[in-house]
Amino acid sequence: MNLFDDDVQLNEHQIAWKSNEPDAIQKCADMFKEKPENEFFKIINAINEKKSMSIAQVDYSKFMVENSLSQFPECMPAVYMMNLVGSELSDEAHFNYMMAAIPRGRRFSKWAKLVEDTSELLVIKLLMKHYTINMNDATEYKRLLEKNNKLPIVLKELKAMVTDEFLKEVTKNVKEQKQFKKLALEW
């Protein structure tokens, strides 16, 4: 016969609850939460595949849902309408509208990303520094210089300003800095 037969083994949740430590209780409660990324993809899949889902306990971001769905042409009318009038809707109403308006289908692709022409950025930053103007004005200067065929002449005069310090201001990427140096030597 064992003297300790009446001792009940407590699990970690019971131990945290009986200790009355808020941090320990919260840590145990957080074990049951899903990662925000998983919740977001569940929402998008529910909209795309027309599966009902409760939005009450989920962190629902109207912006992220609209941004995600706007990557596909067939979803654009619904997303456009929500951008115009959907800001006042509750999360549940927004989700219900998207469920009704978005055509059913499996949508998977990489998101579109902004691709900047780095050589154009170099010219604009160079004009900004030389004329001490802002980026919008430098873009306008560049357009006017190209129109009057004066840009190559101005760049030839300004290539001495392309130093290592200047290139570090333009980009932190060492490979791009080397490309910019090479480009400046060609002017």
From Swiss-Prot:
UniProt xrefs under Pfam families: Phage_clamp_A
Record GO biological process: DNA replication; viral DNA genome replication
Domain of life: Viruses
Molecular-function GO terms, alphabetical: DNA binding; DNA clamp loader activity
Keywords: DNA replication, DNA-binding, Viral DNA replication
Keyword set includes DNA-binding: yes
Annotated family: Belongs to the Tevenvirinae sliding-clamp-loader small subunit family.
Xref: HAMAP family: T4_Clamp_Loader_S
Quaternary structure annotation from Swiss-Prot or TrEMBL: The sliding-clamp-loader consists of 4 large subunits and 1 small subunit. Interacts with the sliding clamp; this interaction allows the sliding-clamp-loader to open the sliding clamp. Part of the replicase complex that includes the DNA polymerase, the polymerase clamp, the clamp loader complex, the single-stranded DNA binding protein, the primase, the helicase and the helicase assembly factor.
Role noted for this protein: Forms the sliding-clamp-loader together with the small subunit. The clamp loader holds the clamp in an open conformation and places it onto the DNA.
Name of the protein: Sliding-clamp-loader small subunit
